[in-house]
């Protein structure tokens, strides 16, 4: 029996803001009602105090030049080095460069108002990691789609870093309701997410992000048409095994299987000889085998067996519901990282089935 883990942005520590009606309420409930500022970085260095007049004169001279002595340490400003900090508690968040431009938490909500309509977002979860080094907001779009009568909900996720470790990322992702599979798909040439670095032009880029993503009724309808196309493509069990293998194995690994007289089916059925001869890792073999099992027995799979839609959901279902990463790591990986790319690649390969 497979367990449905739920949406990747719903995890222990994330704040449920589904009862909030306005952006202001969300910020307050999720603890995002703080601002971030940039400050100069100061270096702390030890000094040896011998008590001589020469040393006292030197320290006085250094203080006049901007240094600060406290106890047995001297503090000097670091040229062209900056840090970000929370202005409410004066907590440092990270080291950044001189051209780093801050994106306040409030800008995330302005984006939702621009993309969906003021006070039209159906808020889901929000929160921050650590002291506020990274924040996120998720909201459900008001328009759902149906794939052969199978409901799929559309979501927007906005993430931002305040510590210099990354930029702003805005993700459009559908979630299949029955199994909570995350369906990250780049529809034709339209990406499902955009990212911006913290440069001086970032605010202008965020303001037009909804145009870049095509986040609108058109985007949702386009995805629905694409999924219904997959639902009408008939596939065999052999097709699905090949599809899963091509998604999860490298071209070199597939070639080694052929060179040693084995097939992806041998790996899916956990053949020890195929594993040894092809030098494919046991971890990959387990993922392929478990994904193939999920194709038949995963939540919501029975009604879509024998279709490309079912094959895609086997991949997304494995990473959404079986893979053992949790919490913020699961959020990052499924929405933006390696797991996201696997799911997106599954959609790209499915059209060729």
Where are these regions (language model features)?
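A short, surface-exposed helix-loop junction/capping segment
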Residues: 74-99
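Amphipathic alpha-helical segments
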Residues: 98-122
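Beta-rich nucleic-acid/ligand-interaction surfaces
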Residues: 124-144
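Residues at beta-strand starts and edge strands
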Residues: 108, 133-135, 152
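Short, solvent-exposed coil/turn segments at beta-strand boundaries
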Residues: 88, 117, 163-164
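N-terminal intrinsically disordered, low-complexity, charge-rich
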Residues: 58, 68-73, 80
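Intrinsically disordered, low-complexity regions enriched in serine/threonine
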Residues: 1-63, 127, 143-353
């Amino acid at each position: 029996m497979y367990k449905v883990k739920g949406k990747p942005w719903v995890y222990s520590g994330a704040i449920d803001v589904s009862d909030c009606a306005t952006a202001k309420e969300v910020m307050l409930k999720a603890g995002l009602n703080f601002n971030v500022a940039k400050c100069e970085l100061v270096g702390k260095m030890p000094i040896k105090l011998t008590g001589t007049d020469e040393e006292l004169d030197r320290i006085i001279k250094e203080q006049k030049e901007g240094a600060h002595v406290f106890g047995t340490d001297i503090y000097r400003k670091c040229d062209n080095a900056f840090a970000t900090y929370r202005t409410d508690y004066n907590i440092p968040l990270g080291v950044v460069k001189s051209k780093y431009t801050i994106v306040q938490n409030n800008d995330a909500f302005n984006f939702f108002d621009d993309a969906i309509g003021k006070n039209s977002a159906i808020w889901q979860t929000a929160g921050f990691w650590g002291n506020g080094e990274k924040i996120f907001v998720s909201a459900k779009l008001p328009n759902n789609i149906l794939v052969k009568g199978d409901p799929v909900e559309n979501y927007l996720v906005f993430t931002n870093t305040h510590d210099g470790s990354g930029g702003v990322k805005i993700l459009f992702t559908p979630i299949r309701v029955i199994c909570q599979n995350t369906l990250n798909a780049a529809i034709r040439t339209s990406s499902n997410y955009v990212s911006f670095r913290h440069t001086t032009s970032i605010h202008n880029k965020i303001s037009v992000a909804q145009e870049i993503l095509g986040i609108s009724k058109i985007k949702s309808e386009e995805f629905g048409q694409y999924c219904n196309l997959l639902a009408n493509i008939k596939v065999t069990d052999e097709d699905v095994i090949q599809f899963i293998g091509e998604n999860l194995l490298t071209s070199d690994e597939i070639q080694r299987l052929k060179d040693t007289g084995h097939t992806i089916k041998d790996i899916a059925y956990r053949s020890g000889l195929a594993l040894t001869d092809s030098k494919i890792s046991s971890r990959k073999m387990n993922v392929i085998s478990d994904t193939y099992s999920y194709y038949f027995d995963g939540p919501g799979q029975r009604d879509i067996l024998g279709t490309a839609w079912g094959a895609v959901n086997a991949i997304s279902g494995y990473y959404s519901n079986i893979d053992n990463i949790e919490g913020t790591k699961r959020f990052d990986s499924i929405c933006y990282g390696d797991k996201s790319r696997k799911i997106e690649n599954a959609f790209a390969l499915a059209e060729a089935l």
